[in-house]
Amino acid sequence: MHQTTIVKKETVDKKWYLIDAANVPLGRLSTLVASTLRGKTKPTFTPNVDMGDNVVVINAKEVLLTAKKDEKKIYYHHTGYPGGLKQITAKDLRQKHPEALVEKAVRGMLPHTALGRKQFRNLFVYAGPDHKQMAQQPMKIEVK
């Protein structure tokens, strides 16, 4: 009789991937990154185990926003004080913190649990073409 194999974090084979975000729509990029971080691309996917791979995203400042979202998309956050609702457009956010656009999009697609926070720590986003994970020899992935 066949038994279902239970994947444990010790048996998970984590790989490193490199994705170039230049001229790639933000939604397509972030769905691919979120799926890879969760491990949904693996045939042994288990929702309660961190089995996702590590992802390095380069050229985040050149990610593509369609339909005038640069001016119209607004990101909100609250300081915690009365009247402390702050807002920033995608264009201003791209100028201040270019990697934050990709990080916010991917974070919203991961589970909002302790496991999701752990998976999010496997994401490394860089504004330019240089990154610090050369020693891991990440494999390049093309976004369609």
From Swiss-Prot:
An MF annotation (GO) of this entry: mRNA binding
Keywords, in A-Z order: Ribonucleoprotein, Ribosomal protein
Coiled coil: none
Keyword Ribosomal protein part of the UniProt annotation: yes
A GO cellular component entry from the record: cytosolic large ribosomal subunit
InterPro entries named in the record: Ribosomal_uL13, Ribosomal_uL13_bac-type, Ribosomal_uL13_CS, Ribosomal_uL13_sf
Function according to Swiss-Prot or TrEMBL: This protein is one of the early assembly proteins of the 50S ribosomal subunit, although it is not seen to bind rRNA by itself. It is important during the early stages of 50S assembly.
Quaternary state and interactors: Part of the 50S ribosomal subunit.
Name recorded for this polypeptide: Large ribosomal subunit protein uL13
Organism encoding this protein: Metamycoplasma arthritidis (strain 158L3-1)
Gene of this entry: rplM
